[in-house]
């Protein structure tokens, strides 16, 4: 037995392996005494160091007045490094340099260790609820009032952040989160395979959550279809990263039944009456444009999942539904969502036929990202977003351009809660910017959030109103955020935008990874969890396999080099790299440089 005593202020991140699954016992809601095995991390913020203790056996941790006592069953080794470690929980290192600066890497590390790991409640906050705890993650670390887990809306971004890390621990957590949602669907007491808005620590589920408007004249149901639409993409992305076809086929039937429930809200014209999708204090009582855009995307991905599983008849069914909804979306109001007069998509159309339009960011941006428009319509949408981008980008990213025009019938009793910037809007705004190859703006967004996070000690709030229209008087004006403190959203979305959009390391249906950067010249990245590294310079790009096994990568450099698709195409860009092998593209036409000869080589 080996004893170690640490100061009381040190934060312990303990590891527990059970039945081949990795779990973290994080500092938040950590029990006074518990057991772990194999390794543990000790973060000393006062000394600005982090220690990794590794052992061949188990250990016990006890918090006492004199300090933190750790009893190891066997010998242990110690490795100490400065600051918050630039690695995931299992020790896979990552390195991000942009123009020689590690600013974004430091933000990534701090978000991961101070927020994402603390959100894992399976063996901490929910440790005694064995029937409930698997896949349970917290949306706020202030659990006194909001200790639930939120499958509708929140799990989407929890999963995006963890897929961006790509390590075995985070992927296992994603799997357990998916299994939790599927289990809730199968045990829906109405047998409608619904995903609840929330699951509380006592096991209570919230399905139909209604909000009333400030003037008490309107009410709307929250997140009616959000959970199941999100689950389709979550399962698809999980498959693309793991290639676990067995997991897909096992759960595809439950997902089909969940989508059957969603289809009930589709009318004969292909319009989805989806009510509120993301904004739970905006009274979208009817046909919600962004909900329908997400539904088109999800039904397309469901068609892909059915094709992967070899069920072509059902794949055709979902593809046809997606096409119907797309056709409806692009029609002029009142039949569709396009305003011929203003040349943009409206926000929602209520059940009385009233059109609500405040130049909603996602109602327009999603139409470009998801390919709903023809080129002329894309130009019109791009023009209106550019016209109001000074509002959208006050902080990444504001929900709408005209938030001051929302009425008391449109705003919920909780106040103008969602009429500001939020991570969920930024997530999809970033994908729109990626589609437009706007690497410079993606960089500015990441830097802006990292700057604010640093000012907040990486303990970010739920919404950032920036004292713009609302919350700018009295006590509310003393801070630029409101809602829940220590919130999950911006940390997870930051990782998603940095890794998936800016750096362009993403899951791929056929290859192990897609390398499709939308970054600026002078970007270098290395991620051991994915086994890849690349360097982008004015001379070109070099991509290397840094793992110990062959890796198949699809390469798409169309967002940083012009003429890429004409030269290489979408189907001829998959390369198999042996360990330590590099793939180089030199002399390419950078979007900021003059045209030059193109060539590629494997080294």
Regions found by a protein language model. Give the residues of each.
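Short alpha-helical functional segments enriched in proximate histidine and acidic residues
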Residues: 238, 262, 305, 325-332
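Acidic/polar, glycine-enriched structural segments that form the non-catalytic walls/loops
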Residues: 4-13, 17-149, 237-240, 245-247, ...
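Active-site core of glycosidic bond-cleaving carbohydrate-active enzymes
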Residues: 151-157, 161-182, 249, 253-260, ...
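Non-catalytic C-terminal accessory modules of carbohydrate-active enzymes
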Residues: 4-12, 18, 428-603
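Long, charge-rich low-complexity segments
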Residues: 208-217, 284, 413-416, 538-553
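Substrate-binding groove/exosite segments of carbohydrate-active enzymes
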Residues: 90-248, 358-372, 409-434, 443
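Gly/Pro-rich turn-and-neighbor structural signature
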Residues: 111-112, 319-338
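Glycine- and aromatic-rich loop/turn segments at beta-sheet edges
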Residues: 121-147, 185-216, 264-283, 330-352, ...
